[in-house]
Swiss-Prot record:
Gene3D superfamilies with a match to the protein in the record: alpha/beta hydrolase (3.40.50.1820)
UniProt KW Transmembrane keyword: yes
Topological domains annotated Lumenal: 33-597, 663-668, 716-733, 838-853, 916-922
Function: GPI inositol-deacylase that catalyzes the remove of the acyl chain linked to the 2-OH position of inositol ring from the GPI-anchored protein (GPI-AP) in the endoplasmic reticulum. Initiates the post-attachment remodeling phase of GPI-AP biogenesis and participates in endoplasmic reticulum (ER)-to-Golgi transport of GPI-anchored protein.
Protein name: GPI inositol-deacylase
Organism: Rattus norvegicus (Rat)
Sequence segments annotated as region (Disordered): 776-801
InterPro entries named among the record's database cross-references: AB_hydrolase_fold, PGAP1-ab_dom-like, PGAP1/BST1, PGAP1_TMD
Topological domains annotated Cytoplasmic: 1-11, 619-641, 690-694, 755-816, 875-894
Compositional bias segments (type: Basic residues): 782-793
Lineage, uppermost ranks: Eukaryota, Metazoa, Chordata, Craniata, Vertebrata
Amino acid sequence: MFLHSVNLWNLAFYVFMVFLATLGLWDVFFGFEENKCSMSYMFEYPEYQKIELPKKLTKRYPAYELYLYGEGSYAEEHKILPLTGIPVLFLPGNAGSYKQVRSIGSIALRKAEDIDFKYHFDFFSVNFNEELVALYGGSLQKQTKFVHECIKAILKLYKGQEFPPTSVAIIGHSMGGLVARALLTLKNFKQDLINLLVTQATPHVAPVMPLDRFITEFYMTVNNYWILNARHINLTTLSVAGGFRDYQVRSGLTFLPTLSHHTSALSVVTSAVPKTWVSTDHLSIVWCKQLQLTTIRAFFDLIDADTKQITQKSKKKLSVLNHHFIRHPAKQFEENPSIISDLTGTSMWVPVKVSRWSYVAYNESDKIYFAFPLANHRKVYTHAYCQSTMLDTNSWIFGCINSTSMCRQGVDLSWKAELLPTIKSLTLRLQDYPSLSHIVVYVPSVHGSKFVVDCEFFKKEARSIQLPVTHLFSFGLSSRKAIINTSGRYYNIELLNLGQIYQAFKVNVVSKCTGGKEEITSIYKLHIPWSYEDSLTIAQVPSSVDISLKLHVAQPENDSHVALLKMYTSSDCQYEVTIKTSFPQILGQVVRFHGGALPAYVVSSILLAYGGQLYSLLSTGFCLEYGTMLDKEAKPYKVDPFVIMIKFLLGYKWFKELWDAVLLPELDAIVLTSQSMCFPLVSLILFLFGTCTAYWSGLLSSASVQLLSSLWLALKRPAELPKDVKVMSPDLPVLTVVFLIISWTTCGALAILLSYLYYVFKVVHLQASLTTFKNNQPVNPKHSRRSEKKSNHHKDSAIQNPRLSANDAEDSLRMHSTVINLLTWVVLLSMPSLIYWSKNLRYYFKLNPDPCKPLAFLLIPAIAVLGNTHTVSIKSSKLLKTASQFPLPLAVGVIAFGSSHLYRVPCFVIIPLVFHSLCNFM
């Protein structure tokens, strides 16, 4: 079989492909920053109080429950309903637990205690029985309807309040966020029941793995509704992504569609969230202390003091979310901040006329105002920059309109500042403030603390450096370099030509300082202007720091902004910035964005080899080895040109109309293009990875069959080769009917798995029989040749009364090896619904809806027949020529329609298997 035909050159090539795939996988699973999230803690024992729901509802949804989270005395007090707080509903995601509400619920409780329960939140959580809704979409609609009922039940718990809530805030983790968005698609749902939606690591754009049509249809329904009704949706929505640490849901999938007439949606990556600044994995995003603190601060700022509920003002909600999640000015949120501030009191005023100034404050007894006159600076400089290491929330920088060196009132410029991990900074373009005569920096009286304030004026051209990124195919052999050799505090490096997801670079920043000064901190901020996916790197100077540079979201076609590396530097230091292409990270981007399509490319390669075997059986009468046919037939030029040509023709109106007229689905390549995910050579890379996977899976299946046959011979009496090759054995119809009944009454995937095991059993039995036959043959080569001649002599008569020879058995095993490979991928792609069914067996004996049932009804009879099929019985079939021609177009179809819709892949496998089985009868 396959093990005896391993070609060393091919083996070396496939080993090399494994090496490349490993580089990409390493970048996805390990090529990110360490987990910097702090663990959130409880200070009292957590309690989850089950909320009694109507019996009718419990009977309709026996697997689902609703809980109220509490701790200590709060939990005891709220066992007696009704409630008095602000309702927040937590929706867990794929395989998520209702207990994941603990972290944010505990932090909210501590915050309420700090303000003596002037306001407090009641956190509810839904128990979805940890269903695998990311893999099986049949229960998503059911979950959505249950959440609707939960919202109505929650609001009933607040009857009797002075200001009873009329809506709830929802926090949805993973698929829970999608379920929350789906609420709006329900016929009887009132949009006013939700006042705020926060989603964490929710794939909004498309499913991570579209393994059944129900999940794809659910996504289509939700996204189409939100796009078509964007003008009428007034729900403030925040989507938070985990960044590169979250390899389960890539951040690009979490970005809500940005529509010009729907401005109440924000999407941000945790690495860009102020006071968080870390990347989170898919689970830690629900307990990461930095992120949960930011979320709770925002929730408390959203409270309306009059109603003691979350505000109904959309503008305020969006302002609060921008304040806490997008740009924090290092000040407490104010709905209507006072722009004009009084600069009075017993304070010292100090004029500063230099263009670069630094002040170290330590145990200051007096308040000091440092005034920078702008008249002369406007003639020379374009911008002013100030920073302070004092991270309090007081106003610290103002603008004076008076022409004198002192002013009683000033424009509070602190609201324009930006909070960073170690400083708060402000950059002003002077021409935007023509009425200002002075910039005033306020230094308060401090005792026992030390901080530094720096200000400088500069020309934009002197602080902006253009650095084109290196070419994709430089493979890190060439680099681009920029040297910053000055005493400035702030620089912008414009990263030209960066905008595609397939680009990935390694940026090295080396800092050197003159003199023996103490270690100081520099901040390097990667700013992506077309999406909130910024990331920060903090470095001690002097140092050498590597920064990973790659994108979550590609630059839109109509966007002309340039990605920036903002450098908050130290004076009297030199910075050398080197950028070069990172080939492992490019492979990582391929895996990250397209790894889910790999099964389609694997099946496409196997189908090409399968077609080659059928053709060799037709033309030569012998079936060649799977590995040989894979090397010969699995070529990307047999597939990719057709997909590219179809995509090109679909650009013409007449072809698109013809395409739609025959009801063909949308080409997957067009879907990827709409998501800015198509890039050069990706299909070629995936095809090579797919062929490599097909090769190793063939090697594994062949080795498994031989191992199982050896165990068979060790445990049972040696078998013999069958004396005839009848396809229809007496037990075959009965077995087929049993499997079909199992499929109808329980789960289609279970029936497919059982029929697959039956097929493997038949192949193992044949392998054991062949091994026994060979072991019993005499060693004399002359006798072997006579036997071979005798076998060939009876070849024609074998057609009339076929008998299975050793050569025929080997041919059959070669064909069976390929069929096992195809069936293995069908079983793997159907396993999620089987796992879902088995987990919910105590609630539902029959899976409904069942995505695999139609597949099972076609596949089971074909597998049953193929289990008894031998090559000798189909060599003379009139249908063999047709069967050998089908795999090639189907291999193209798998890539064209199955790479983004994996549930379609088994459909392309069934067709050649059915024709193969029919060859026994025609």
